Amino acid sequence: MDNFLNDSKLMEDCKSRQWLLSGESPAISSVMFSAGVLGNLIALALLARRWRGDTGCSAGSRTSISLFHVLVTELVLTDLLGTCLISPVVLASYSRNQTLVALAPESHACTYFAFTMTFFSLATMLMLFAMALERYLSIGYPYFYRRHLSRRGGLAVLPVIYGASLLFCSLPLLNYGEYVQYCPGTWCFIRHGRTAYLQLYATMLLLLIVAVLACNISVILNLIRMHRRSRRSRCGLSGSSLRGPGSRRRGERTSMAEETDHLILLAIMTITFAICSLPFTIFAYMDETSSLKEKWDLRALRFLSVNSIIDPWVFAILRPPVLRLMRSVLCCRTSLRTQEAQQTSCSTQSSASKQTDLCGQL
């Protein structure tokens, strides 16, 4: 009982605190801000170079920018915008030694921070879902994908996602849910326990993560089927004297390699977001009277913020040579087994075809 009263007093003190306690350091926030801005700028520079290469391509040549890369560009822009709009408020709080509640009249800085934090976290997850859905349709329904989806349509995804995130995250401004300040006074978020809005927000993130994982699993299964079909076709054609379809087979292998690269990139981003969202989900579903809740407050926010820092670095690090290396490592054992099985199968088919020819001559 005493612990509950002490936690309640601490929570109330955090909500109304005007000054930061001595010993609070902006080091972690500064490092996160610098890493986020630098990573997003590097990712944007790499994407800009790819866009410039795409505009220089002739009409008959193969373009280098796909719908997937349009969505990646929008994700990086979202992460950069979120970092630049959120982190400076925290750094201003440290520089003035004031909490967010005291930083602006009527707690406007606290409301601004909480709204932008919820908005960009949801927008990021929706962008990852759009990328996963694009991969799912590209592999599972190629005819529908080529007929109805285009790069121009991808440009409309960002305003749609921003509009949906704006509507959902504005509910506390319409008195459903409430934004409050949390310890140590340098961040604000949805109030725990007043309404079910915090749990609703966490549930939406969980559902999006599950949907992204389901799309990725479906893409993996479809890629396995494509690999098996291409293996059979190569085996069937190896015993014949026809060489015409060689360029088509090379195109199929290139397409499969690109799809695998996109899947690796998307899978790592999804796993990163799932890990970064886990502390927040635990915090959202904790009992308000739990003595552990106070320890999870700042930890949950920092984990949620780290995602926008990691995403651009994932894209910047996983360049095509690195993706090819990862693909070769992941597929090494499978490739060895496939080659052995293919050689056995092809030799069997070749001997069978020879026997058929001999029978025809007799």
From Swiss-Prot:
SUPFAM superfamilies: Family A G protein-coupled receptor-like (SSF81321). Residues 49-66, 134-152, 225-262, 324-362 are cytoplasmic. It is a multi-pass membrane protein. Its main location: membrane. Residues 1-24, 93-112, 178-199, 287-299 are extracellular. It comes from the Eukaryota. Disulfide bonds join 110-188. GO terms for cellular component: plasma membrane. Receptor for prostaglandin E2 (PGE2). The activity of this receptor is mediated by G(s) proteins that stimulate adenylate cyclase. The subsequent raise in intracellular cAMP is responsible for the relaxing effect of this receptor on smooth muscle. This is Prostaglandin E2 receptor EP2 subtype. The gene is Ptger2.
